Amino acid sequence: MDYIDWDKYIYMSSTSVYNPKHMNTVEADFNGYSNDFVWCNRFEFPYEEIKRQAEYALWQKYSDKKWIAVRYPFAIGKDDYTKRLLFYVEHVMKSEPMYIDNIDYQMSYIRSDEAGEFIAYLVDKDIEGAINGSSTGTISLREIINYVEENTGKHAILSDDGEVAPYNGEPEYSINTEKAEKKGYHFSNLKEWIY
């Protein structure tokens, strides 16, 4: 980035920069000046720290440039190669035990295609710095599991000895998108598409 020039740089960050996420998480909850950045590659630190380091670089080294750091929660959709949400559905369908440590926590998500649409929307908008993107509303894993059970007749097997679920360790949180809404973007309602 030291050798190129740009009108606006849009970086796809993550809500994992927030430590911790909580209900009504706002952009100011992560300060890009709170720590010194370290030049590193993506394998030197855990995912959330890599995202923080990338933002530290934008805030501290490139503060004289126009940039946006778009912070998303888990992006899910047909192209979700992580298959984290599918883990829960498949374990219910196959009656395989799973260990979930946050089954009743409300969490935020965004549709993967909407994540792309929002980045495209920002291209010609007068905005700089961090901005959150997330579907409106939250849902718990229990609500998702209950839906699968009700529509398939299958039952979840929850066990401390079950396979560790991919969203374990996530806190209860929601992502505030008022900044994006003030710029004219309105996110979809999570419960209108998640099922």
Briefly describe each language-model feature range.
Residues M1, P20-M23, D79-Y81, R142-E143:
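Short glycine-/acidic-enriched loop or helix-start segments at secondary-structure transitions
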Residues D2-R52, W67-I68:
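Conserved Rossmann-fold NAD(P)-dependent oxidoreductase catalytic core, especially the SDR/UDP-sugar
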Residues S13, A54-D79:
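Conserved beta-loop-beta element that borders a ligand/cofactor-binding pocket
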Residues E48, A69, Y109, T138, ...:
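Short aromatic/basic micro-patch
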Residues L58, V92, K179-E181:
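Structural element of the ATP-grasp superfamily
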Residues V89-Y99, D104-T138:
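Alpha-helical substrate-binding/gating segment
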Residues S112, N146, V164-F187, E192:
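Conserved C-terminal active-site "lid" loop/helix of NAD(P)H-dependent oxidoreductases
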Residues F118-E172:
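Mid/C-terminal beta-alpha module of Rossmann-like enzyme folds, strongest
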